[in-house]
Structure formats: structure tokens, C-alpha cells
Amino acid sequence: MFKRIDHVEIVTDQLDRTVQFYTGVLGFTVKARDRIERSGLGVPIDLVYLDLGGTVVELISYEGTAIEPAPQNEHLGYRMIALEVDDMQKATDFLRSKGVEVVWGPRVRETYSRAEICDPNGYDIELRQWFT
């Protein structure tokens, strides 16, 4: 019946910058692009589908309308996406070389290491290296 999580959606007002970050820094590839001329808000929206290892992130940009930013950090509801990395030190060194700030961690626990970065919209992205 239920097979897998198909995609996660991120609303942005910086579509090109966000696509560049996810593809140029994090290694996602553009799977598809779409434009819907009249969304539920009555304005056109641009969609970019990004793929990483079979998981898709759908970027959504509403044309010409102000959208309230998501609440920061601790709140009820979804909080962040997490990317698994092979080597936390190499991943964080690479991200820093690209000008990406590691805003939390790395913190090493018995079975994993984790750190956090932010995308250009300020959304948290967790990095996780499993040791088992």
C-alpha cells in the first residue's frame, strides 16, 4: 500500500539561489521543472524537483506574493530534513569551503554524529553519519 516518502516541499522566495545551493553545494540534481499558471493562492507558481539518492525535494516559488516565513527552530510540526553523509568531517570541511556555515555540531554520540547547516532560506538541514 504505502511505498515510501515521495517528496518534501520547501517554499522559497529565492528559487534560483536555492536551486544553486541544493545542486551546486549539496549534490542534488534537477529532476523536473514545472509552472502552474494559477495556484490555490490565485498566482502562478514555479516548481523545481530536486533528486538526491531517490529522495525528492520540491521547491515552490509563488510569483509576486508575500509568504510568511516558517517559524524558527522549536515549534510543533515538521522541523527539518536530514541528509546522511559518509564522513562528517569531510562533509563539514567541504561545506565550509563553499561558504556554508555549520550552525550546530558536529556532535558525536555512540552510534552517530550529527551537525546542522541552513539553506539560503534559513531552513535547517541536518547532517547525519551513522556508525553502525
Name each region found by the language model.
Residues 4, 43-46, 77, 111:
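Exposed loop/turn and edge beta-strand positions of beta-sandwich/beta-sheet ligand-binding modules
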Residues 47-48, 81, 115:
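Residue-level detector of beta-strand structural context in well-folded domains
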Residues 61-66, 129-132:
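Acetyl-CoA-dependent GNAT
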